[in-house]
């Protein structure tokens, strides 16, 4: 949600920001709708004050046994006008509807561009494996080892699902435990276990609704399955006012995530790259305005640390204005090397949403200045660290051997009964 006062004071700057995010000029419309709403509310407050005065007059006249029919009729007329204006306010949602679909303002650092082709590479890490044989895809490796089953998953649930067996199921669990251990023990995040079904208000709070309603699954009783733990973790501070001394708050969780993948027809049809259901470890930070810039750098480095420990080659990209997520002001994507595709693919996205989500959630913090309490909206950040399915893909492809077996990364072996090789499963 945007600050209307900022739009009023900076209409040209706001229009430029929206144009860079592929929206037209809209500031004038917002200012006009806001002025109309303010005028309507002024009328309402004036009528309410007038009715209160008449009510007091009626009570006084009755007490003195003086006739007050005229005042009673006038009170009724004013009440009708108040009810009419209240109904207008309830039904006139044009301003809110407009603000709800406008994305966040890009940070000044964000490069201007149309799509992913205009993203900027920030840094690279790791050396790509020089295979002495043609590398197989993750799904060829998984199916050949009898550890990855898409056919049985399709019988159960349809396309874009997978069944992992034996050592790959262990790898999935090992990765979650490994990532959470790093985040909590080395970087001070607090682990949270949370519901995967949430109210639509929680989805609205982080910007998933109303614009992206088709991208998530909805139950018959109006719950939503979360597309990411960001929804649950960020909403833990909705409608709160935190003491600034308690910030930053750093949270992490591993959860199942659910996405309809609307608009993804034909993309990554084979394999685990794009699934309706997957596991992901998420990071969320709740910080002050002054802390948020450095917090994004820290969060990105935390996500990178997982890939460094797994010894997987990757690069960090800064997204351009045309590729930014709806709620993000600035985003770093971390892309891991996928040998079979001969390209880097996204495995993490770390974003600073500044106060955009906080306004939707009414999440504030307070400081004391000159003896007075000062309230501000918190800044929220989120990052994948990491998407577990895509990490499995990267491990299978980068650690594959010529015989089709997979070497288990050293840091994961203690989570997998000290095994060092993933090999054919007899089940």
From Swiss-Prot:
Class of this enzyme: ligase
Pathway(s) annotated for this protein in UniProt: Aminoacyl-tRNA biosynthesis; selenocysteinyl-tRNA(Sec) biosynthesis; L-seryl-tRNA(Sec) from L-serine and tRNA(Sec): step 1/1
The entry's keywords: Aminoacyl-tRNA synthetase, ATP-binding, Cytoplasm, Ligase, Nucleotide-binding, Protein biosynthesis
Annotated protein name in UniProt: Serine--tRNA ligase
Transmembrane segments: none
Recorded catalytic activity of this chain's protein: tRNA(Ser) + L-serine + ATP = L-seryl-tRNA(Ser) + AMP + diphosphate + H(+); tRNA(Sec) + L-serine + ATP = L-seryl-tRNA(Sec) + AMP + diphosphate + H(+)
Location in the cell: Cytoplasm
Subunit composition and interactions: Homodimer. The tRNA molecule binds across the dimer.
Biological source species: Ehrlichia ruminantium (strain Welgevonden)
Name of one Pfam family that matches: Seryl_tRNA_N
The UniProt record lists the keyword Cytoplasm: yes
Sites where the protein binds L-serine: 228-230, 282, 384
Chain positions recorded as ATP binding sites: 259-261, 346-349
Entry similarity comment: Belongs to the class-II aminoacyl-tRNA synthetase family. Type-1 seryl-tRNA synthetase subfamily.
Record remark: domains: Consists of two distinct domains, a catalytic core and a N-terminal extension that is involved in tRNA binding.
Organism taxonomic ancestry: Bacteria, Pseudomonadati, Pseudomonadota, Alphaproteobacteria, Rickettsiales
Gene Ontology MF, one: serine-tRNA ligase activity
Entry EC number(s): 6.1.1.11
Keyword Aminoacyl-tRNA synthetase appears in the UniProt entry: yes
Job description of the protein: Catalyzes the attachment of serine to tRNA(Ser). Is also able to aminoacylate tRNA(Sec) with serine, to form the misacylated tRNA L-seryl-tRNA(Sec), which will be further converted into selenocysteinyl-tRNA(Sec).
CDD domains: SerRS_core
Gene Ontology annotations for the cellular component aspect, listed alphabetically: cytoplasm
Protein's GO biological process: selenocysteine biosynthetic process; seryl-tRNA aminoacylation
Principal localisation: cytoplasm
């Amino acid at each position: 949600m945007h600050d209307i006062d900022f739009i009023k004071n900076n209409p040209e700057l706001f229009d430029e920001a929206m144009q860079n995010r592929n929206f037209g000029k809209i500031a004038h419309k917002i200012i006009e709708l806001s002025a109309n709403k303010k005028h309507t509310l002024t009328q309402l407050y004036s009528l309410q004050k007038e009715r209160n005065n008449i009510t007091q007059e009626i009570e006084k006249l009755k007490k003195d046994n003086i006739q007050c029919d005229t005042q009673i009729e006038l009170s009724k007329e004013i009440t009708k006008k108040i009810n009419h204006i209240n109904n207008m306010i309830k039904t006139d949602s044009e301003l809110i509807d407009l603000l709800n679909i406008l994305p966040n303002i890009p940070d000044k650092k964000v490069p201007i561009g149309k799509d992913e082709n205009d993203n900027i590479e920030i840094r690279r890490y790791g050396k790509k494996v020089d295979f002495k044989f043609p590398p197989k895809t993750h799904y060829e490796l998984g199916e050949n080892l009898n550890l990855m089953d898409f056919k049985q998953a399709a019988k159960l649930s349809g396309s874009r699902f997978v069944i992992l067996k034996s050592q790959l199921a262990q790898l999935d669990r090992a990765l979650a435990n490994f990532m959470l251990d790093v985040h909590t023990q080395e970087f001070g995040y607090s682990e949270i276990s949370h519901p995967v079904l949430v109210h639509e208000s929680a989805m609205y709070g982080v910007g998933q609704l109303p614009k992206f309603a088709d991208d998530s699954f909805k139950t018959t009783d109006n719950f939503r399955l979360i597309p990411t733990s960001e929804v649950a973790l960020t909403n833990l501070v909705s409608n709160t006012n935190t003491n600034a001394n308690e910030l930053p708050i750093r949270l992490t969780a591993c959860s199942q995530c659910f996405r309809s993948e609307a608009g993804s027809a034909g993309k990554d049809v084979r394999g685990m790259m794009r699934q309706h259901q997957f596991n992901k470890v998420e990071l969320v930070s709740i910080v002050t305005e002054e802390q948020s810039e450095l917090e994004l750098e820290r969060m990105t480095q935390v996500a990178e640390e997982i890939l460094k420990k797994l010894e997987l080659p990757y690069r960090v990209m800064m997204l351009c204005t045309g590729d930014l997520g709806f709620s993000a002001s600035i985003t770093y994507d971390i892309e891991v090397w996928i040998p079979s595709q001969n390209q880097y693919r996204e495995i993490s996205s770390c974003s600073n949403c500044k106060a955009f989500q906080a306004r939707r959630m009414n999440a504030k913090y307070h400081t004391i200045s000159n003896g007075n309490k000062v309230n501000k909206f918190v800044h929220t950040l989120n990052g994948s660290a990491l998407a577990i399915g895509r990490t499995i893909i990267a491990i299978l492809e980068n650690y594959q051997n010529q015989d089709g077996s997979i070497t288990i990364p050293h840091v994961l072996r203690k989570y997998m009964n000290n095994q060092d090789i993933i090999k054919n499963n007899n089940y």
